[in-house]
């Protein structure tokens, strides 16, 4: 595993220096995928200089008046609109070192790349009116689930567009909104927290959203502090996200180690003045939905919800590769909960996860329920180093109590060369292995385990929840035979619970994780950890 750290360092150095690609590639189930590259200087159609100087990562002093909420939107959008296909709009520092741009919703077009240069940040407006799609409720929490906010950056039906560079996109989720009923009284993340406290639906903008289209690229950019999901692809064919960093909340809205002062977080006070990953709700990192040929490689994700959520609600999602990534706080590399149109052919390789013993931490997770279930098949996790994760392995078709007739079916799942180093704080940890058996349906979880090793105290099997049975239940285990399975002796076969075991564990050494973990701050200076 450890050869990748040299590659990561080279790639990071190349981006910081503004160099082109280092020539790395990854092997996906559908073929080789090459590292993207920065555009040549000759391919830059327009260079725009920053005019804002952030103060400690904040531009709140600039746009307290909502009339000044997006001073750079028109010139960035005009540059994109007038840029020929195959060229890039480049955002650079100003002549006096200014590094900030401030904009509302922008639209990419086919063949055009937005290049955010080293040290430059594109800040998102905190005026909900700059994102509202016509419903008039962006920046509020509603009983309706109809989405009312456009994303900061939208790529609709584009071919060959993307966002690259060693700069950053900052959604300013911890800043007070400046218009509407919540003006100057709630931050975006306070609004999101109303989902938990009042059961309302947040109407907050995402940062990057693709609709349909093909060949979309994200390369090197840091994406942080989104009011909602960071990156979502919907119905897109060919998505490459390489060397990206998702850091939420960043130091602009937190403190070192996420050690917020008592009473400063949104579960205790409104508006909050300090945020932790546990208190920035619905801030998924990378969500490919209804998409094909998706790569996330050499990337780092720290956030308040799913690191990744692979979804299939209105079309199948298939052919995905997650390679050489580092995950920190978050709710796991997840499939679901929407799986009704099917997820298939996914490989996860060389992944490290350090959950920092968060109360909401998940590792590898497939989740769904009878309202949105479908077939999830041919999923391989190979080469995983994990520590301090509350729920390391979760295969759960009873994710909620919502009823329906779209039944989950998880088949041909493989977990191999998995090594969990335990919990530094000795928190109570659990695992979930469940097939779907209800409503006269019987869809067993079929899963192969090979060299699945836990150091220290084994996580317990999860108890019953949301109408489902205690774990394991409805599971057909196969032991691959190469390496051990630490909890093999705890699996009780039974015709009553439909738990079967085929094969025997092997004796190979556990995966070496001694050099696997990388402090996030070493690659993302805005990180509190």
UniProtKB/Swiss-Prot annotation:
GO terms for molecular function: polygalacturonase activity. Pfam families: Glyco_hydro_28. Its EC number is 3.2.1.15. The active site is at 305 (proton donor), 331. It is found in: Secreted. It is an enzyme of class 3 (hydrolase). One of its GO terms (cellular component) is extracellular region. Residues 516-529 are annotated as: Required for PGA export across the outer membrane and catalytic activity. InterPro entries: GH28_Enzymes, Glyco_hydro_28, Pectin_lyas_fold, Pectin_lyase_fold/virulence. Keywords: Cell wall biogenesis/degradation, Glycosidase, Hydrolase, Secreted, Signal. GO terms for biological process: carbohydrate metabolic process; cell wall organization. Residues 1-21 form the signal peptide. It catalyses: (1,4-alpha-D-galacturonosyl)n+m + H2O = (1,4-alpha-D-galacturonosyl)n + (1,4-alpha-D-galacturonosyl)m. Contributes to the wilt disease production on tomato. Belongs to the glycosyl hydrolase 28 family. PANTHER family: PECTIN LYASE-RELATED, PLASMIN AND FIBRONECTIN-BINDING PROTEIN A. Monomer. This is Polygalacturonase. It comes from Ralstonia solanacearum (Pseudomonas solanacearum). The lineage of its organism: Bacteria, Pseudomonadati, Pseudomonadota, Betaproteobacteria, Burkholderiales.
């Amino acid at each position: 595993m450890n050869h990748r750290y040299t590659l990561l360092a080279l790639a990071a150095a190349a981006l910081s220096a503004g160099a082109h690609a280092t020539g790395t590639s990854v092997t996906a189930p559908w073929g080789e995928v090459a590292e993207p590259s920065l555009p040549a200087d000759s391919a830059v159609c327009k260079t725009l200089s920053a005019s804002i100087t952030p103060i400690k990562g904040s531009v709140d002093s600039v746009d307290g008046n909502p009339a000044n909420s997006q001073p750079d939107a028109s010139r960035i959008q005009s540059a994109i609109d007038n840029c020929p296909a195959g060229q890039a709009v480049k955002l650079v520092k100003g002549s006096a070192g200014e590094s900030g741009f401030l904009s509302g919703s922008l639209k990419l077009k086919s063949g055009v790349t937005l290049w955010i240069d080293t040290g430059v940040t594109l800040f998102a407006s905190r005026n909900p009116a700059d994102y509202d799609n016509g419903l008039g409720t962006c920046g509020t929490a509603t009983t309706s689930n109809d989405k009312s906010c456009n994303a900061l950056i939208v790529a609709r039906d584009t071919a060959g567009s993307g966002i690259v560079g060693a700069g950053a996109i900052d959604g300013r989720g911890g800043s007070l909104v400046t218009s509407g009923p919540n003006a100057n009284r709630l931050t975006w993340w306070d609004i999101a927290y109303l989902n938990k406290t009042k059961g309302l639906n947040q109407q907050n903008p995402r940062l990057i959203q693709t609709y349909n289209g093909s060949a979309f690229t994200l390369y090197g950019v840091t994406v942080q502090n989104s009011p909602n999901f960071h990156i979502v692809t919907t119905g897109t064919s060919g998505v490459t996200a390489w060397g990206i960093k998702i850091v939420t909340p960043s130091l602009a809205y937190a403190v070192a180690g996420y050690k917020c002062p008592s009473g400063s977080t949104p579960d205790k006070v409104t508006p909050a003045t300090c945020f932790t990953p546990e208190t920035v709700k619905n801030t998924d990192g990378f969500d490919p939905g209804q998409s094909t040929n998706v790569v996330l490689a050499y990337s780092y994700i720290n956030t308040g919800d799913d690191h990744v959520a692979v979804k299939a609600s209105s079309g199948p999602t298939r052919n995905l590769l997650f390679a050489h990534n580092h995950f920190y706080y978050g709710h796991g590399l997840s499939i679901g909960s929407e799986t009704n149109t099917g997820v298939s052919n996914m490989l996860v390789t060389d992944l490290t996860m350090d959950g920092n013993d968060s109360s909401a931490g998940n590792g590898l997770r497939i989740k769904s329920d009878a309202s949105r279930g479908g077939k999830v098949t041919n999923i391989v996790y190979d080469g995983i180093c994990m520590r301090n994760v509350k729920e390391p392995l979760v295969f759960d078709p009873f994710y909620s109590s919502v009823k329906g007739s779209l039944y989950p079916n998880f088949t041909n799942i493989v977990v191999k060369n998995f090594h969990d180093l335990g919990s530094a704080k000795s928190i109570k940890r659990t695992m979930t292995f469940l097939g779907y058996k209800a409503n006269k349906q019987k869809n067993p979880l079929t899963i192969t385990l090979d060299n699945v090793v836990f150091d220290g105290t084994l996580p317990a099997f999860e108890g019953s929840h949301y109408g489902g049975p205690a774990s394991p239940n409805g599971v057909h285990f196969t032991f691959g035979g190469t390496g051990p399975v630490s909890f093999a002796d705890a699996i009780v076969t039974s015709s009553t619970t439909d738990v079967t075991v085929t094969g025997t564990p092997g004796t190979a050494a556990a995966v070496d994780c001694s050099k696997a973990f990388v402090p996030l701050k070493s690659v993302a200076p805005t990180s509190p950890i």
